[in-house]
Amino acid sequence: MTDIREYLARKPLLFDGGMGTYYKAAPGADCEMANLTDPEGVKKVHAEYLAAGAQAIKTNTFGLPRMAAAQMPGWEELAEAGWKLACDAAAEKDAAVFADLGPAPDTEAAPASSAYGLVAQQFAALGAKNFLFETLSSDVGIVEAVKALRVAVPDAFVMVSFAVLPDGYTREGLLFRDLLRRMEQSGVVDAVGLNCVSAPGAMKKLVQSLGETLLPLSVMPNAGYPVVTRARVLYQGKPAYFAREMGQIAAAGVRILGGCCGTTPAHIAALRAELDALPQQTEAAPAAKLSTGAAPAVEKDDTFLRKLNAGEKVIAIELDSPRVADLSGYLDGARRLQAAGADLLTIADCPIAQARMDSSLVACRVHRELGMCALPHMTCRDRNLNATKALLLGLYAEGVREVLAITGDPIPTAERDEVKNVYQFNSRKLAQYIVSLAGEGREMPSAMTVFGALNLNARNFDVELRRAVEKLENGMSGFLTQPVLSAQAVENLRKARQTLGERAKILAGMMPVVSQRNAIFMENEINGIHVEEDIIQRFAGLDREQGEALGLEVSMQMAREALPYADGFYLMTPFNRVALMERLIARLKTELLDAEG
């Protein structure tokens, strides 16, 4: 085939379909391994797609970046075999061959850019000129790998395609518009696109909502949505429907088309006929723009944020939601804390992985019935992306516009057979996702404010600070810290202020210790809390009244030391002792905050 860029200037380019699902429709080995164990079978699949009218095919190497990241032996041989099989099949039809690279995991030990780079360079050494990075949930490592690739192959044609759910977000919570825009702005990519996860009808809506793109756009949806029949995953989307929807996508100006999971040669043949029936055009037409349909903003109480942004010291207080279905006592406690002077009520999301009333639902009740600013904690532990989004939309509609994004305590090992962790993303990605929901044409007219956790007691606080910087870069506005109960925690707070600067609002955590037993438990059994031995020993032999009195003194001492580096305080209520926290709030206001003001 002539140069891909020249071809696209004249007419749309039709790719093949889902190699993996089509090959596995017949008994056989794993798809990539078949390059060595069943080369004729792989070549036959290529030939069927070409006979159906495809002008470009992908090498049978989707899983190689994952294999390279895991340092699996033999992936280089799979790349070479896959490349030769595709080239041999394409030669008979003068079709283009794209080196196909699926997603790579990203870890500190094995960055995604390294895996992408290894596989891309392997294909470059084999003579590849066209590259497809596909089914990606994020763009991590892509630009770095492509820049390195262009050193070896300056005239390479590089496509980058993202796997997007019907709502426009990847499984990592990234909005497709943002991903495509970043790829366009990188200056190293030739075409951008969407593939997999969604069916053609949903993908058509995404394309119509996108507007004009600077680079050629690729669309390769699944044949439909999967069903499980007799323990097999099948796609039942009909070729005629697939072709009709894709024909409308092509008419909107999309220049690169094809199929992903479940698309067979029959789907590609039907699409070939649909494309041949379209009027010829020499330039890509912009995709249509639809009205945003954005809902009007709902009124909310922003007293807390207004004070915080004005430089006033604020008081946030945490009150754990009940373990039972009765919220009346909880609301009474919240009302007392509000009257005492708390600016914000925070509600933990099932702390130490033990079920309590949902923090977001409690926040809505507090906001609605008390008119108090509420900050629900939201963990990554218990919800996937869909459940998280549904909850966020509900919070926004209820006027709760602040959230604390945390990874969350893991489920205890003994319970994991019955209760499963989710952890689809970490707190940084969750924050990025929450921020991405807001804006013109998106789900929320205005952005929610996202806070994060900062562990002042981390053993390696330099690593914790680096993560804090990443959290800010991903959209967080500030931090609530773990309890300050040591001189080292105060020093780490000072370092945090110095490193993060004034752009980060920091609320210093204060949790009154109420007994020696309580102090020992906190030191030994609660992750992220460190109580100095001197403090533990001071509680020896004290009764409840004496313990609370000393706990207040220790908290006030720590608050005085933390105040120069904090924008306020984050108070944690031990054992739901509201009366104790009323006393602490009163002392903080009269002895520190009012005096400072």
Roles of regions detected by a PLM:
Residues M1-G597:
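Domain-level signal for soluble alpha/beta catalytic cores
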